Amino acid sequence: KYDMLHVPVRQNNENTATVRQRMQAGCRILCIQFTNSDAFAAGVVLDGTGQEIAVKFWKGGKEYSHHCRKLLEKIKKSQEATGGRQTGRVDQKYWMHLKHLSEHYGHQVTSQILRFAVEQNVSVIVLPRYNQEYSRNVMKGSGNWGPLHLSTRIGQYLDYKAWKNGIIVIEVHATGISKI
């Protein structure tokens, strides 16, 4: 049995400017797009005028997919060995390993993104937000254990980790962005 204790911690932050105030001040922005390839995410840093300053790709998607595929093969092999007559929590260790693997990669990529944001003196991180139906179809098409599936976990981790560094994370609807 796994019990997790979450204790809320109060932490003061000196930079409490809103996104609008930061944009008017000409702060740098990191825009991130998640992928389903070897790169978990691609990011570009823009200055206040919209000029590109730096570009970065965070890799490891193939490695993550490979580890997940190996664990799923072990689960399938275990189920075939018992002829589908499994009772209880037979493959729990494999499922927990998959869960911990996704948490590990989520934290790892989040830390890399945040390190890059701090190096580039970024004030706002922008993540894409899609409508629910589109997200559901894309996630279903990418598979449960593909790199794209980690985008929600990475977004959640980025939210609280960036706040500690005085960076605001926002989600912007991605409709029509490709037309610009």
Model-identified regions with their sequence ranges:
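Positively charged, helix-rich recognition surfaces that bind polyanionic ligands
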Residues: 3-180
